[in-house]
Amino acid sequence: KANGRKTFRQIDSVSRILELGRDTYREGKLSRESIKMICEELEGLKHKMEEYKITEYRAYATSAVREADNMDLVLDVIEHTTGIRVQVLSNSEQRYISFKGLVAKYSDFHQVVSKNTAFVDVGAGSVQISLFDKNNLVVTENIPICAVRVRDYLALIGHKSGRLDEIMADYVDNDIVSFRNIYLKDKEIKNIIAVGEVVSSLKKIVPELSIKDVITRAQFDAMYKRVISMPAQELAEKYGIPYERATLMLPNITIYQSFLNNCKAEEMYVPDVDFCECIVANYMDEGSRVVFNHNFEEDILATANNIAKRYRCNRNHVEQTAYFALKIFDVVRKPFGLDKMQRLQLQIAALLHECGNFINLHDGARNSYYIVANTEILGLSHKERMEVANVVKYNPLYLPSKDKISAELDGCDYIVIAKLAAILRIANILDKSHMQKIEDISVTLKDGKLIILAKTYEDISLEAGLFEARADFFEQIYGIRPVLRVKRSV
């Protein structure tokens, strides 16, 4: 419930754990029995919503449904059986919502991330690691360590070996070490913020330590020894933990231990934040119902900038291209129905449009497409990221008609791609020399023309000569003709 002070309070809470991941990660799809249980539980929640006269809701599915081969069938059955429409979150959307919830609830967040900090989000299907430095998001990477698969592997070999902790560490360490070698190198991580489904349960198993929000390395080691020495059933009964979560405690704590060992952090922050609270925080933020002391868009752009840095993009060129692109966008935004997210997509596309040159210069645009399409950008859905990838691809390349590439678009909006690519082509050509000859531009829409007034004291014959060809495509998409005019600065 939201109140007038732009905060919210919980008025009721109901929950039920259904272990759907077991089906997906073992069999590749959700079983008929699991689908039936989902529908039964959602019917109960539907009655609860009717009790409170709820008219607006959010129903999300994550990796257990997202990675199931029968995902579309599952969603269709749920909607027709319960009337509830479920939205499947991409991994980046899911982790971004978790991040928002952490910022909303954890009052010490900004103080902690002022130093080199790793945000480690362990889910049932994978692990998301995000690195912060001086309050800025430096990099985020999804590592395919599946806690459910790790648990099943433990069950398979556990009775055959007395070296369970060593085997477990070997199983997990490979991916964590690869992450360290690529992203950490000599960087020293001061803090770890641990979130995930079992973090609050982990704190319960060492009640004598009275752990609240911070775990020292010595406390963590004591916690690890207790988890590895007790079977899941005993952990569940002794500490009042749901059995399904108890079975995931050893895989989770092994993952955290591996990261602690590889980054040498001495403290781990464990705020009590569950995903439902994160969903509420995201809902409040989307509707501007609450004001966060954090700029999430800057985190998304920081991720894009670090991808550009990784692939040795010409920083001066891509930043000027982005600046010019946004100036054009802001003029055509309202009359042509563009929105805030598309502005962000355009900015990211401008920052990353040359990243493919790192692979080779012969086919840079297609290389850039593959890099963007396969790189995690926290805060963008799969569809939004693929639209950015296509904008980058069709910045220099011919854009075929929709019917010729509809299969390749994978649900992306063709019109959005065309509109953003048209802007990027103009912005990019204004710095064709990569020498920033144009100091600034002013953009106006007048008499069916987009007037771009370039301020420069340099010879921009190259840019002006190539401008007309790019203007043809822009006019084809928007129905207005870009015109380049030059204002000589002294």
Regions found by a protein language model. Give the residues of each.
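Short, non-transmembrane amphipathic alpha-helical segments
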Residues: 461-481
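A short amphipathic beta-strand at an alpha->beta junction
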Residues: 266, 478-490
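N-terminal basic/disordered segments at the start of proteins
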Residues: 1-9
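Active-site-adjacent helix-turn-beta-strand microarchitecture at beta-sheet edges
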Residues: 123-126
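Short secondary-structure junctions
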Residues: 432-438, 476-480
